[in-house]
Each structure stands twice: as structure tokens, then as C-alpha cells.
Regions:
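Structured catalytic/translocation cores of nucleotide/phosphate-coupled proteins
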Residues: 9, 14-26, 60-65, 87, ...
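ATP/nucleoside-binding phosphotransfer catalytic cores, i.e., glycine-rich phosphate-binding loops
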Residues: 137-212
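Active-site histidine-anchored catalytic micro-motif
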Residues: 1-14, 65-68, 79-107, 132-133, ...
Length: 212
């Protein structure tokens, strides 16, 4: 759904260690038995050459749209790197927002902070090491997909940073108004399944301090 980029819009190659496309190939494609792997040319990822027409490639490969979007929500309410309030996904209305396809994104600072806690960047809040730019599918690609699977389960980033922030943004996505200010809220208008863990669903309440 997305990939890192630099400030000039150059897409990170799959040889870049934290590459999302590289992780897709390693953790998905290469886990198939060699005799069961689909042809490599059927595995699509971002490059400098295809970013301008990636939405068209999705529609061409999927006979009109993607069959399935598998996703989770970011702290800022994004899906993929469709961050709210960015120039890339600026729109005057929700209807216009839903027509926007793949593009280069100057990520919001909260997204960068969240990503800095991922194991690929050391799970340590190292903002200097964490990319500030990306390329991403757009609302058009997500909204038009035939089916959707969302996961809300309070995971961990590496060995630290329990993602308790998910509780609030998940509630906004699932139960709040459908708005471009919470891009992931568009899933409310889509066919699909949202998995919500018991830990995620429990009430938001004050936590007791533990004496050390």
C-alpha cells in the first residue's frame, strides 16, 4: 500500500533495509514453497517509474479495482500513508477526497513519530533515522476495493512501545463521522470486516500507577 521516499520524491528501492516492498517480498512471497510461488512479475511494488500511474496499475491488474485491502490504522487516523491535512490529499469535500489516487506524501509529524517506534527503525524514537516522506495508495484505491480487512488489536512495536494510542483512534475510525480528517473512517462506507481485540474494546479509563 505504501513505501518510503526521500524529499525529492525518489522511491526507496526494495534493497533499502526498512523497505516496505522488500518486507512484502521477504515476509509474504518468499514464504511460499518455491513450486507454489506465483510468477515474480505478479508481485507489484512502488518504483520511481510507476508511482505516477500506480492506481491505474491496481485497476488494470484487478480488473477494475483491488480484490482485498488488508490494513490497520495509524495514530493520526491514516490508512496506508493517507495522512489527514497533507497537501497531497487536499480536497474540498469528502467526495473529492475519495477520487484521489496514489501519490507522493510529506508525512505528518505524528506519523513520523509513530514510525520511529517500529522495530525497523530501532523502536527508540530516532526521528532522524525515520523517513519523513512516502508514496501511498490513495482513498480512491481503498474505497473502490471489493473487500476490506482491518485489524485493531493493540500490537507491540519491537520489544517496547505498547500501542495503547490505538484505542482512541480506532473508536474515531469505527464509530465517528466519516471524514477526510480521519482518512481511515472511509472504511465505514466499505464492505469488509474489522477485527477488534478484547483489549482494544475495553473501556478507556485511568490506569493505576505502579510503585517502583
Amino acid at each position: 500500500m505504501d513505501e518510503w521516499a526521500d524529499e525529492d520524491g525518489n522511491v526507496a528501492p526494495i534493497s533499502y533495509a526498512p523497505s516496505l516492498g522488500g518486507a512484502f517480498l521477504k515476509e509474504f512471497y518468499m514464504r511460499f514453497r518455491p513450486d507454489l510461488r506465483p510468477p515474480l512479475e505478479q508481485m507489484h511494488y512502488y518504483t520511481n517509474e510507476n508511482i505516477e500511474n500506480y492506481s491505474d496499475l491496481i485497476e488494470e491488474a484487478g480488473d477494475g479495482c483491488a480484490d482485498l485491502v488488508i490494513s490497520a490504522t495509524g495514530w493520526i487516523g491514516h490508512t496506508a500513508f493517507v495522512d489527514p491535512g497533507t497537501e497531497a490529499f487536499k480536497a474540498d469535500s469528502l467526495e473529492e477526497f475519495l477520487t484521489l489516487g496514489t501519490r507522493f506524501v510529506d508525512n505528518r509529524r505524528l506519523t513520523i513519530i509513530q514510525n520511529s517506534m517500529a522495530p525497523t527503525f530501532g523502536a527508540s524514537g530516532d526521528l532522524a533515522y525515520t523517513p519523513a516522506y512516502s508514496v501511498s495508495v490513495g482513498p480512491r484505491d481503498i474505497f473502490n476495493a471489493r473487500d476490506h480487512l482491518e485489524r485493531h488489536d493493540l500490537g507491540y512495536f519491537g520489544n517496547s512501545s505498547y500501542s495503547s494510542w490505538e484505542r482512541m483512534i480506532s473508536r474515531l475510525q469505527i464509530y465517528g463521522p466519516v471524514t477526510k480528517d480521519v482518512p481511515a473512517s472511509i472504511f465505514q462506507r466499505c464492505k469488509g470486516t474489522v477485527f477488534v481485540s478484547e483489549d482494544m474494546a475495553r473501556p478507556i479509563e485511568k490506569m493505576d500507577f505502579v510503585a517502583l
